[in-house]
A protein has these predicted regions:
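S-adenosylmethionine/decaboxylated-SAM
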Residues: 1-205
Length: 205
Protein backbone atom coordinates (compact mmCIF):
# COMPACT_ATOMS: atom_id res chain seq x y z
CA UNK A 1 0.00 0.00 0.00
CA UNK A 2 1.59 3.23 -1.18
CA UNK A 3 0.37 6.22 0.83
CA UNK A 4 -1.42 5.18 4.01
CA UNK A 5 -2.26 8.60 5.51
CA UNK A 6 -4.06 7.80 8.80
CA UNK A 7 -4.02 4.06 8.16
CA UNK A 8 -7.69 3.44 7.39
CA UNK A 9 -6.89 1.43 4.28
CA UNK A 10 -4.19 -0.54 6.08
CA UNK A 11 -6.62 -1.49 8.83
CA UNK A 12 -9.28 -2.42 6.27
CA UNK A 13 -6.93 -4.66 4.27
CA UNK A 14 -5.62 -6.27 7.45
CA UNK A 15 -9.10 -7.19 8.72
CA UNK A 16 -10.67 -8.10 5.37
CA UNK A 17 -7.85 -9.89 3.58
CA UNK A 18 -5.72 -11.20 6.45
CA UNK A 19 -2.62 -10.97 4.24
CA UNK A 20 0.41 -13.17 4.60
CA UNK A 21 2.44 -9.98 4.27
CA UNK A 22 1.48 -6.34 3.76
CA UNK A 23 3.88 -3.45 3.27
CA UNK A 24 2.69 0.11 3.72
CA UNK A 25 4.82 3.14 2.92
CA UNK A 26 4.02 6.73 3.82
CA UNK A 27 5.79 10.02 3.06
CA UNK A 28 5.08 11.44 6.51
CA UNK A 29 7.73 10.51 9.05
CA UNK A 30 5.27 10.71 11.95
CA UNK A 31 3.74 7.32 12.87
CA UNK A 32 -0.03 7.29 13.41
CA UNK A 33 -0.72 6.18 16.98
CA UNK A 34 -4.21 4.86 16.23
CA UNK A 35 -2.85 2.62 13.46
CA UNK A 36 -0.08 1.32 15.69
CA UNK A 37 -2.64 0.49 18.38
CA UNK A 38 -4.85 -1.26 15.83
CA UNK A 39 -1.98 -3.40 14.56
CA UNK A 40 -0.92 -4.34 18.07
CA UNK A 41 -4.41 -5.72 18.64
CA UNK A 42 -5.24 -7.22 15.24
CA UNK A 43 -1.86 -8.17 13.75
CA UNK A 44 -0.50 -10.58 16.33
CA UNK A 45 1.60 -12.41 13.73
CA UNK A 46 3.28 -9.16 12.64
CA UNK A 47 2.27 -9.57 9.00
CA UNK A 48 1.91 -5.83 8.43
CA UNK A 49 5.05 -3.73 8.02
CA UNK A 50 4.59 0.05 7.86
CA UNK A 51 7.52 2.26 6.90
CA UNK A 52 7.29 5.99 7.54
CA UNK A 53 9.19 8.76 5.78
CA UNK A 54 9.41 6.99 2.42
CA UNK A 55 8.92 8.89 -0.84
CA UNK A 56 6.90 6.87 -3.33
CA UNK A 57 9.23 7.97 -6.15
CA UNK A 58 12.42 6.81 -4.41
CA UNK A 59 13.75 4.32 -6.94
CA UNK A 60 16.27 2.92 -4.49
CA UNK A 61 14.35 2.74 -1.21
CA UNK A 62 11.01 1.43 -2.48
CA UNK A 63 12.44 -1.62 -4.32
CA UNK A 64 14.70 -2.33 -1.33
CA UNK A 65 11.71 -2.41 1.02
CA UNK A 66 9.68 -4.61 -1.32
CA UNK A 67 12.59 -7.03 -1.59
CA UNK A 68 13.09 -6.99 2.18
CA UNK A 69 9.45 -7.80 2.95
CA UNK A 70 8.50 -10.08 0.05
CA UNK A 71 11.81 -11.47 -1.16
CA UNK A 72 11.47 -12.82 -4.69
CA UNK A 73 7.75 -13.54 -4.35
CA UNK A 74 5.37 -11.82 -6.72
CA UNK A 75 2.86 -9.36 -5.31
CA UNK A 76 -0.89 -9.94 -5.38
CA UNK A 77 -1.84 -6.28 -5.35
CA UNK A 78 -0.53 -2.73 -5.18
CA UNK A 79 -2.66 0.23 -4.09
CA UNK A 80 -1.35 3.71 -4.92
CA UNK A 81 -3.16 6.29 -2.78
CA UNK A 82 -0.13 8.49 -2.19
CA UNK A 83 0.70 11.85 -3.79
CA UNK A 84 -1.93 11.81 -6.57
CA UNK A 85 0.71 13.50 -8.71
CA UNK A 86 1.66 12.32 -12.18
CA UNK A 87 5.45 12.11 -11.87
CA UNK A 88 5.73 10.28 -8.53
CA UNK A 89 2.88 7.95 -9.48
CA UNK A 90 4.56 7.00 -12.77
CA UNK A 91 7.75 6.23 -10.85
CA UNK A 92 5.83 3.96 -8.48
CA UNK A 93 4.10 2.18 -11.35
CA UNK A 94 7.39 1.55 -13.13
CA UNK A 95 8.88 0.05 -9.98
CA UNK A 96 5.99 -2.06 -8.74
CA UNK A 97 3.78 -3.13 -11.65
CA UNK A 98 6.43 -5.58 -12.94
CA UNK A 99 6.48 -7.19 -9.46
CA UNK A 100 2.83 -8.24 -9.68
CA UNK A 101 1.93 -11.86 -10.32
CA UNK A 102 -0.04 -12.81 -13.40
CA UNK A 103 -3.59 -11.39 -13.02
CA UNK A 104 -2.40 -9.33 -10.05
CA UNK A 105 -4.09 -5.97 -9.64
CA UNK A 106 -2.68 -2.45 -9.50
CA UNK A 107 -5.11 0.09 -8.04
CA UNK A 108 -4.75 3.84 -8.57
CA UNK A 109 -6.99 5.97 -6.38
CA UNK A 110 -8.31 9.53 -6.80
CA UNK A 111 -7.10 9.87 -10.39
CA UNK A 112 -9.97 12.25 -11.21
CA UNK A 113 -9.29 14.77 -8.42
CA UNK A 114 -7.76 17.42 -10.70
CA UNK A 115 -10.87 17.47 -12.87
CA UNK A 116 -13.23 17.68 -9.91
CA UNK A 117 -11.25 20.63 -8.56
CA UNK A 118 -11.35 22.31 -11.97
CA UNK A 119 -15.12 21.86 -12.16
CA UNK A 120 -15.59 23.35 -8.71
CA UNK A 121 -13.39 26.33 -9.56
CA UNK A 122 -15.27 26.98 -12.79
CA UNK A 123 -18.59 26.82 -10.96
CA UNK A 124 -17.29 29.34 -8.42
CA UNK A 125 -16.04 31.58 -11.21
CA UNK A 126 -19.42 31.48 -12.92
CA UNK A 127 -21.33 32.30 -9.75
CA UNK A 128 -19.17 35.27 -8.70
CA UNK A 129 -16.56 36.21 -11.33
CA UNK A 130 -15.24 39.28 -9.50
CA UNK A 131 -14.66 37.46 -6.22
CA UNK A 132 -13.07 34.52 -8.03
CA UNK A 133 -10.71 36.85 -9.92
CA UNK A 134 -9.67 38.54 -6.66
CA UNK A 135 -8.88 35.22 -5.01
CA UNK A 136 -6.89 34.03 -8.00
CA UNK A 137 -4.88 37.28 -7.96
CA UNK A 138 -4.13 36.86 -4.26
CA UNK A 139 -3.12 33.24 -4.78
CA UNK A 140 -0.53 34.29 -7.36
CA UNK A 141 0.57 32.35 -10.41
CA UNK A 142 -1.06 29.01 -11.02
CA UNK A 143 1.52 26.25 -11.37
CA UNK A 144 0.86 24.26 -14.53
CA UNK A 145 1.36 20.55 -14.05
CA UNK A 146 0.56 17.35 -15.86
CA UNK A 147 -2.78 16.13 -14.51
CA UNK A 148 -2.78 12.84 -12.66
CA UNK A 149 -5.36 11.54 -15.14
CA UNK A 150 -2.69 11.53 -17.87
CA UNK A 151 -1.36 8.33 -16.32
CA UNK A 152 -4.76 6.66 -16.68
CA UNK A 153 -5.02 7.67 -20.34
CA UNK A 154 -1.53 6.31 -20.98
CA UNK A 155 -2.34 3.00 -19.31
CA UNK A 156 -5.42 2.59 -21.51
CA UNK A 157 -3.24 3.07 -24.59
CA UNK A 158 -0.60 0.75 -23.12
CA UNK A 159 -3.21 -1.99 -22.78
CA UNK A 160 -3.97 -1.66 -26.49
CA UNK A 161 -0.28 -1.76 -27.46
CA UNK A 162 0.83 -4.45 -24.99
CA UNK A 163 -2.15 -6.59 -23.90
CA UNK A 164 0.25 -9.30 -22.77
CA UNK A 165 1.52 -6.79 -20.20
CA UNK A 166 -1.79 -5.07 -19.42
CA UNK A 167 -4.81 -7.14 -20.47
CA UNK A 168 -7.36 -5.04 -18.62
CA UNK A 169 -7.83 -1.45 -17.47
CA UNK A 170 -11.07 -0.75 -15.62
CA UNK A 171 -11.80 2.92 -14.92
CA UNK A 172 -14.45 4.48 -12.70
CA UNK A 173 -14.61 7.95 -11.20
CA UNK A 174 -11.81 8.17 -8.71
CA UNK A 175 -10.42 4.65 -9.10
CA UNK A 176 -8.57 2.71 -11.78
CA UNK A 177 -7.80 -1.02 -11.80
CA UNK A 178 -4.92 -2.29 -13.95
CA UNK A 179 -4.43 -6.04 -14.37
CA UNK A 180 -1.05 -7.69 -14.86
CA UNK A 181 -0.62 -9.81 -17.96
CA UNK A 182 1.29 -13.02 -18.63
CA UNK A 183 4.44 -11.61 -20.23
CA UNK A 184 7.55 -10.78 -18.19
CA UNK A 185 8.36 -7.11 -17.66
CA UNK A 186 11.80 -6.00 -16.57
CA UNK A 187 11.87 -4.09 -13.30
CA UNK A 188 11.93 -0.36 -13.88
CA UNK A 189 10.69 -0.56 -17.47
CA UNK A 190 9.77 3.05 -18.34
CA UNK A 191 6.14 3.79 -19.04
CA UNK A 192 6.99 5.00 -22.55
CA UNK A 193 8.04 1.43 -23.42
CA UNK A 194 4.52 0.25 -22.60
CA UNK A 195 3.11 2.70 -25.16
CA UNK A 196 4.93 1.86 -28.37
CA UNK A 197 5.89 4.49 -30.93
CA UNK A 198 2.32 5.51 -31.75
CA UNK A 199 1.45 5.94 -28.08
CA UNK A 200 4.65 7.87 -27.47
CA UNK A 201 3.77 10.27 -30.27
CA UNK A 202 0.23 10.68 -28.90
CA UNK A 203 1.53 11.78 -25.50
CA UNK A 204 4.76 13.38 -26.72
CA UNK A 205 6.95 11.21 -24.49
Amino acid sequence: EVGIDQGGGTAYFTKLLRPKALLGIELSSEPVCSLQSFLEEHDKKKCVDVRWGVDQSDTQKVPELVQEVFGDEYLDAVVDDASHLYGPSVATFEMLFPRLRQAGVYIIEDWSADHLIERRLMEEAASDPEDFARRVAVAGDVVQKTPFSMLIAQLVVASARNPDWIPLVRVARGICEVRRGIAPIASGTPLRDYLGELGQSMFNV
